[in-house]
């Protein structure tokens, strides 16, 4: 959900900028239907400085829904003013033209950065390293609906790590750390399995020099915020029951078959 919210915010600001509109973040009955609890609903504000947000929001305005999971060029070009956008909007194309502003909005809060810098110092700097790899494994909800969002096999991570430096630490970020602690693939001292919350995990991802992402908007954003092109991603995003993910892919990243 965190990554999905980030796409929704970035696309809203991107469309507003392209059209010369003001924008705001939803906070009301419609957004309550999207997020299970208040913590999820306001996680963007818990994580980021969000310098570009506005407070005014009209729940009574009509809803404008994206046409499909693909980038909706017609919506981007012709979106009317004073509407509530509804959809996933999972493409950089919605906000590439204001990348600088989105990066400023998604700058982590100082309290978040402080803890992450302390962890980085302990795992990387104090051990004599200057670089690290961020690796994300998404499992729990993907195990429930594998034909929609399949869990990536360990072979994907093996191949991805084989393409990156072999003598630097690897942060392992996962929603199932107990599984990772028990898996022989992660037994080496090279791996540090994070048990932080997802805000601090994404912050640490953004500090990594190389990123191996899962088929997940969470690690997509962690890699995007890192701001480098040394990102390895799976070609497989959805299973046979899923959507067409073509526009979520970024050309400058490297993609592996699964």
Predicted regions located by residue number:
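N-terminal pre-catalytic "stem/leader" segment of glycosyltransferase-like enzymes
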Residues: 1-28, 32
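Short, solvent-exposed loop/turn segments at secondary-structure junctions
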Residues: 1-3, 28-33, 89-92, 138-142, ...
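Aromatic-acidic/polar surface patches that form glycan- and anion
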Residues: 1-5, 149-153, 197, 204, ...
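A structural signal for isolated positions on well-ordered beta-strands in alpha/beta enzyme cores
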Residues: 22-24, 134, 169-171
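Secretory-pathway luminal glycosyltransferase catalytic domains
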Residues: 28-166
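Short, aromatic/basic amphipathic alpha-helical patches
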Residues: 34-52, 179-188, 243-249
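Leloir-type glycosyltransferase catalytic cores
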Residues: 80, 115, 240-258
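Donor-binding and catalytic core of enzymes assembling or modifying cell-surface/extracellular glycoconjugates
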Residues: 164-234, 239-247
